[in-house]
């Protein structure tokens, strides 16, 4: 199959998923072209500039494709004008709600209007979590296919031997409101350990810190199906996370991790402290989580599902 992938970036979150999926498809004999354009690196202009430039590039692209796959709403315009037999739009989380939390009312209003239009353009909509699927069904009466993003287990071989640091708690992610980093900082003085914040590290550095830690804290206010949780599962580091979005699809409380309410520094600190001293529970969580991610969230499991999804779409 011949693909055009469209994403504002090919790293982190949904962009990282787009990059990994493109690589997996290429390694399995499919052709994938990643549409890439520069965009203005100024707040509130990054996505609009990407939308304009990517749309123009898509219009003048003389190639034809079996499938144009866009990742997130800003990519939808380029998808709309792509010369492809079928078109797919993937969203990880509810776009309008994310913009509402992070930007002004005027920006949010425009984003929601664009979202409602863009959702009508593709032949198929996908998301990575049942939670996001449910919200879009309730809000827009639209059916999303759930195709979780996977982790590339081969990449973890790049991480060398790492010594565990007792009572180290780590945070991996952006320094942003929706990730709840401020909640962890409020809880930090009550945590009986050292908290390490990784907001701008290379992937290998971040994974090494996860591997060396006793706990990974995920204090998010909004999430779909966070890759950090899957990575921690694979690296045998227990996770304490908020019960928002798709996180409960990964973490079964007291089985594959610990769930706490969002926006509650005290309960977050208490859960972390309890797990730091309970080695039996920590070992149980590590074992269960590692089995779960290897059985459900690797490319060996997920790539055949993506390929079947594309093949079924083309034959429809």
Segments (PLM) and residue ranges:
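Active-site proximal beta-strand in glycosyltransferases
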Residues: 67-69, 82-100, 126
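Conserved acidic donor-binding segment of nucleotide-sugar-dependent glycosyltransferases
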Residues: 253-254, 258-265, 274-280
């Amino acid at each position: 199959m011949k693909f055009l992938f469209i994403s504002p970036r090919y790293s982190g979150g949904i962009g990282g998923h787009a990059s990994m999926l493109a690589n997996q498809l290429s390694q399995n004999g499919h052709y994938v072209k990643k549409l890439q354009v520069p965009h203005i690196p100024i707040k509130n202009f990054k996505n609009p500039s990407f939308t304009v430039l990517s749309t123009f590039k898509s219009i003048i692209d003389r190639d034809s494709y079996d499938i144009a796959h866009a990742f997130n709403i800003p990519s939808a315009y380029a998808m709309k004008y792509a010369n492809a037999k079928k078109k797919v739009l993937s969203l990880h989380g509810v776009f309008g709600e994310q913009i509402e939390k992070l930007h002004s009312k005027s920006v949010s209003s425009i984003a929601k209007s664009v979202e409602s239009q863009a959702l009508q353009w593709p032949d198929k909509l996908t998301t990575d979590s049942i939670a996001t699927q449910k919200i879009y069904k309730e809000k827009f009466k639209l059916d999303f296919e759930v195709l979780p993003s996977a982790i590339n287990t081969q990449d973890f071989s790049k991480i060398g031997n790492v010594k565990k640091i007792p009572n180290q708690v780590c945070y991996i992610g952006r320094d942003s409101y929706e990730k709840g980093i401020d909640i962890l900082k409020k809880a930090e003085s009550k945590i009986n350990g050292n908290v390490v914040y990784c907001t701008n590290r290379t992937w290998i550095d971040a994974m090494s810190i996860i591997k060396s830690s006793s706990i990974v804290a995920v204090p998010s206010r909004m999430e779909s199906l966070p890759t950090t949780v899957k990575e921690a599962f694979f690296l045998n580091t227990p996770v304490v996370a908020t019960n928002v979005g798709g996180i409960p699809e990964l973490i079964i409380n007291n089985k594959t991790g610990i769930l706490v309410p969002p926006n509650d520094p005290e309960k977050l600190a208490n859960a972390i402290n309890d797990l730091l001293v309970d080695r039996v529970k920590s070992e149980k969580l590590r074992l269960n989580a590692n089995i779960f991610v290897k059985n459900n969230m690797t490319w060996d499991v997920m790539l055949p599902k993506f390929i079947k999804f594309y093949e079924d779409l083309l034959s429809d």
